[in-house]
Amino acid sequence: MTHQRHRREVVARLLRARRIGTQEELLEALRAGGIEATQATLSRDLAQLGARRVSRPEGGTVYELPAGAAERDGLATLRGLVSEVASNASLVVIRTHPGSAPAIARAIDLAGLPDVLGTIAGDDTIFVAPAGELRARKLATRLADLLGAPVAGEGPAQ
């Protein structure tokens, strides 16, 4: 896992676990966990995660992750169970360890990814139908990144 990905996962966990209202509070929490970051880096991380500040009824604001963020993080917990992600012009195929496909397909469905129309899972293979006119190759690359798996013909995912 890259340092950037690890930091973003920690930021997401902190935002789900605590009421954090400022980037300074978040920087302090990261530093307490041994992670150094600049305000500019943290700002980019928050934007990448889709975090936004929302007003609280009792006053003040807190950072909040968009709906589905926890489910997308759930996909990351399934890393290591996916062997490969491949695609053709209209379909993405995910190859998994035996018995893992149903759980991974369910996690993809629960993640609420707007690029995914739906999934069908067997024992070790998942068919993923892209939504709309999205090219299957782009979706394959995105799923491979979320699941930490290589895209067929491209080598290991970063």
UniProtKB/Swiss-Prot annotation:
Q: Does the keyword Hydrolase apply?
A: no
Cited Pfam families: Arg_repressor (PF01316), Arg_repressor_C (PF02863)
| InterPro entries registered for this protein in UniProt | Arg_repress, Arg_repress_C, Arg_repress_C_sf, Arg_repress_DNA-bd, WH-like_DNA-bd_sf, WH_DNA-bd_sf
Q: Which GO terms describe its molecular function?
A: arginine binding; DNA binding; DNA-binding transcription factor activity
Primary localization? cytoplasm
Q: Name one GO cellular component term.
A: cytoplasm
Question: GO annotations under biological process?
Answer: L-arginine biosynthetic process; protein complex oligomerization; regulation of arginine biosynthetic process
State which pathway it belongs to.
Amino-acid biosynthesis; L-arginine biosynthesis [regulation]
The highest taxon in the source lineage is: Bacteria
Task: Enumerate the subcellular locations listed in this protein's record, separating them with semicolons.
Answer: Cytoplasm
Disulfide bonding pattern of the chain: none
Keyword DNA-binding among record annotations: yes
SUPFAM superfamilies reported in the protein's UniProt record = C-terminal domain of arginine repressor (SSF55252), Winged helix' DNA-binding domain (SSF46785)
**Key words, A-Z:** Amino-acid biosynthesis, Arginine biosynthesis, Cytoplasm, DNA-binding, Repressor, Transcription, Transcription regulation
Family designation: Belongs to the ArgR family.
User: Which HAMAP family does this chain map to?
Assistant: Arg_repressor
State its role: Regulates arginine biosynthesis genes.
Indicate what this protein is called per its UniProt record. Arginine repressor
UniProt lineage: Bacteria, Pseudomonadati, Myxococcota, Myxococcia, Myxococcales
